[in-house]
Amino acid sequence: MSIKSDKWIRRMAAEYNMIEPFEPNQIKQRNGESIVSYGTSSYGYDIRCSDEFKLFTNLNSTIVDPKRFDSNSFVDVKGDICIIPPNSFALARTVEYFRIPRNVLTICLGKSTYARCGIIVNVTPFEPEWEGYVTLEFSNTTPLPAKIYANEGVAQVIFFESDEVCETSYKDRNGKYQFQQGVTLPKI
């Protein structure tokens, strides 16, 4: 299994629509202003979050249960930024839509710009033949409110190509998060 380079990522995006929309370069500025970078990097792709957020709230004072998750635990927020309260979290989705090849697995890691501010981005691996928008989780580990910027870089996807094709892909298993279109809450 080997990590894939910028050249491979560009080729897969062009020939197989692996990432849409796709940015072949690293974008660091918009309208002359510095932003959190996104686009193709040396050995990965820096993804952006859209302007659709689900902000966790404790208004209902319920127990957080992944098997019986109460969707009322979130408030929908749409905008260029999302302010996450102290010691809380928010969900978002990527701007980019992914189509992962059958012989590829990805790992997604938060960008250091956010990590150095106490904001942790968590995403599980994109499995072989998974397709959809990625649901992102932002945890604010600080005692202060934290700001997330929509349409800027939030995490880096690293692509690994296997030496052999898996017997059963995410698509073959009818994975519950296949083809997700928006911010997707826990499913059992």
From Swiss-Prot:
Q: Where does dCTP bind?
A: K111, S112, T113, Y114, A115, R116, T135, L136, E137, Q156, Y170, Q180
Organism classification, top ranks? Answer: Bacteria, Pseudomonadati, Pseudomonadota, Betaproteobacteria, Nitrosomonadales
Q: Which UniProt keywords apply?
A: Hydrolase, Nucleotide metabolism, Nucleotide-binding
Instruction: Spell out the family assignment given in the record's similarity comment.
Output: Belongs to the dCTP deaminase family.
Which is one GO molecular function term here?
nucleotide binding
State if rRNA-binding is listed as a keyword: no
Q: How does it assemble?
A: Homotrimer.
Record's catalysed reaction(s): dCTP + H2O + H(+) = dUTP + NH4(+)
Q: What is its EC number?
A: 3.5.4.13
- Active site as annotated: E137
The answer to whether UniProt assigns keyword Cytoplasm to this entry is no
Function in brief: Catalyzes the deamination of dCTP to dUTP.
User: Which Gene Ontology biological process is one annotated for this entry?
Assistant: nucleobase-containing small molecule interconversion
Its pathway is: Pyrimidine metabolism; dUMP biosynthesis; dUMP from dCTP (dUTP route): step 1/2
Q: What is this protein identified as? A: dCTP deaminase
**What Pfam families does this protein's entry cite?**
DCD
Taxonomic source organism: Nitrosomonas europaea (strain ATCC 19718 / CIP 103999 / KCTC 2705 / NBRC 14298)
